Amino acid sequence: MKKTPFLTLEKAREITAQIPTPFHIYDEAGIRANARALKEAFSWNRGYREYFAVKATPNPYILKILNEEGCGCDCASYTELVLAEAVGITGHDVMFSSNVTPELDMKKAVEMGAYINLDDSTHVEFLERVAEGKVPQTVCLRYNPGGSFSLGNTIMDMPRDAKYGMTEDQMAGAINRLMKLGTKHFGIHAFLASNTTTNEYYPELAANLFRLAVRLRNATGAHIAFVNLSGGIGVDYRPEQPCCDIRIIGEGVRQRYEQILVPQGMDDISIFTELGRFMLAPYGHLVSTVLHQKHIYREYVGLDACAADLMRPAMYGAYHHITVLGKEDAILDHVYDVTGGLCENNDKFAIERSLPEIDIGDILVIHDTGAHGHSMGYNYNGKLRSAEVLLKQDGSFQLIRRAETPADYFATFDCTEFRFNV
């Protein structure tokens, strides 16, 4: 199956006349349509809510778009909370899912009235202290089942090796302590696998959490108000990969809900999700220009973007599809390593990739960078983080984050006697 960019060469040239490459660009129309499809897939649950994983794409314009489509924010740090607050997203529109949580972060979440998702049973007392004895009426607890998590005969991940969450006994103990402190309602949460491309992950996770909800209710008498399925739904980074069908996924969760919760009289439980990759990855491109070519033992194409703009290929060996704009239908009769300019040999967007013949000055689109793209950027080698651009529904574009400048890079030396001529 062919991957088609949402950006044309004509539009790219229009944008680059004002905003130089490299930059990340996001497709507003695609983001909105996908958010609506997700909401429709879970419309059978009257309390359903998506809490977008801010870590995936922490830009206020993106959060505003998703909030307009009914999404809240899943925040994991003080700065992510501040970002959500700046957009006007507060209270129970925020899920605070953190681990090894600093007091400043917890205090901010409490002040904002966010749902607090506790990662450890000892955080009950931590929350009580930070909240000055006034614990929230609703608290969420993160579950770690241990062992391995499998779908059929396929092991998806190893929860026993994960630093996150509590055992079931710890959750029951935490619920009992929280009820004594005044908490009335509880949520349960788990994240057991990442970037799954099967329609069975969410339904299987849901079944596990629904059964857990029943056991915890029976053991403690607590009211379980919501089940948070977290993230984990993946995208088809490779053209030949299967693509998740959110309608099938939503129906699978509904069936488990009807089978497990309804007979137990627990049909008031809301379903929450914390998707990031699924919400944004396909609707973002990294746009870059070819600077150089090199012909040694391999053929190299050097871009003005590097791993500082997109870390996933260097960090994980992740595949990201590449389109040469204006050559979408050309024969893929050349083999290139597509690289950036970092002083690291893993700074490669593609290794021995079949592509059309590439010329210096060509504009390349690196697909599926809408999540964990710009957000994982860094300044190694003194590289400056790129701009972010929004391709709006009417075809116009807007700069939604400027590129860093050398002045930005040196700004934190303002406590020193050194001066930098930039």
Positions of PLM-derived features:
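A charged N-terminal "starter" segment
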Residues: M1-Q137, A172, K180, K184, ...
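Charged (often Lys/Glu-rich) extended helix/loop segments that serve as interaction or gating elements
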Residues: L9, L261, M266-V422
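Conserved, mostly hydrophobic/aromatic
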Residues: I31, K55, S77, A109, ...
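Flexible loop/turn segments at secondary-structure boundaries
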Residues: P58-Y61, L83, P102, S148-F149, ...
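Short acidic, glycine/serine/threonine-rich loops at helix termini
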Residues: L63, A86, M106-V110, L127-V130, ...
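Structured core elements
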Residues: G72, M95, N117, C140-R142, ...
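Glycine-rich, aromatic-flanked loop segments that form ligand/cofactor-binding clefts
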Residues: K134-S148
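Active-site loop/helix belt of alpha/beta enzymes
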Residues: P145-L291, L355
